[in-house]
Amino acid sequence: MRLAILTDIHGNVQALDAVLAELDRQQVDEIWSLGDMIAMGPDSNEVMARLLDRGVHMITGNHDEAVLSLLEGKGHPESYVHTRPHHEWVARTLKPVYADALFKLSRTIERDVKGTRVYGIHYHIPTEKRGVPITEEPFHDIVEATLSNMQSLYGAYEADVICFGHHHPEHVFRDDAKHYFNPGALGVARDNLARYGILEWDETGFAIHLRAVRYDKRAFLEAMERNDVPQRDVMFRLFY
């Protein structure tokens, strides 16, 4: 059994296509996408088309939910005020069929695979905020990637493997009870690597693999310019 873990694709269809081609060669059994499929990059519609066509199991992230909140007329998170012009552009250009698909998604996913409880979430949400909208800032602030911090965030989760994203660098930690796995952002990096992860089971147990594949970053950057993506200069400086 091979379960692929993707997160933070962020509208980067070039990076996603490179990863999907790799997954085809590896013959994975299931794919999860742990939120932030859309926004930042120029091709949110194309990304959603690929994921739906592949039957990828998706959950929402903060960018997805911020765009959906605008589409519903329910406002925009105060802490994301700097991203509002960009999110408004995504909301205007996102095709209704893909918005509808995003509206149907949950914030979490879980599966028992050969006795291993696997749980996916975009990032930790405190218990008291599990049901609140994105305008009430449900996702925990990003913390430094250390084992003790992961234990503080996810230690009470009833699972053996906690998979998440949001914080773009990859990190893998383990204690006696749990594995904490962030494969890294697929679509946002300084280099030209698209990152993802594989959980693999055999007769002896399971293993976690970090993976990365090169993609055509020049084509991605050209698409950002061609599509006149709002706030792209800021994103180039901070993320790409």
Which residue stretches match the model-derived regions?
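Metal-dependent catalytic neighborhoods of phosphoester/phosphodiester hydrolases
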Residues: 37-54, 67-79, 173-176
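Active-site environment of divalent metal-dependent phosphoester hydrolases
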Residues: 10-15, 39-41, 63-69, 126, ...
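N-terminal active-site segment of His-dependent metallophosphoesterases
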Residues: 1-54, 229-231
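Acidic, His/Gly-rich catalytic cores of divalent-metal-dependent hydrolytic chemistry
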Residues: 161, 173-240
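Active-site neighborhood of phospho(di)ester-bond hydrolases with catalytic His/Asp-centered motifs
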Residues: 6-7, 31-36, 57-62, 121, ...
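Anionic-ligand binding region
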Residues: 123, 132-172, 179
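Active-site neighborhood of divalent metal-dependent phosphoester bond hydrolases
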Residues: 54-111, 139-155
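Beta-strand-turn-beta hairpins that frame and shape the catalytic cleft
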Residues: 1-4, 110-119, 175-180, 205-207
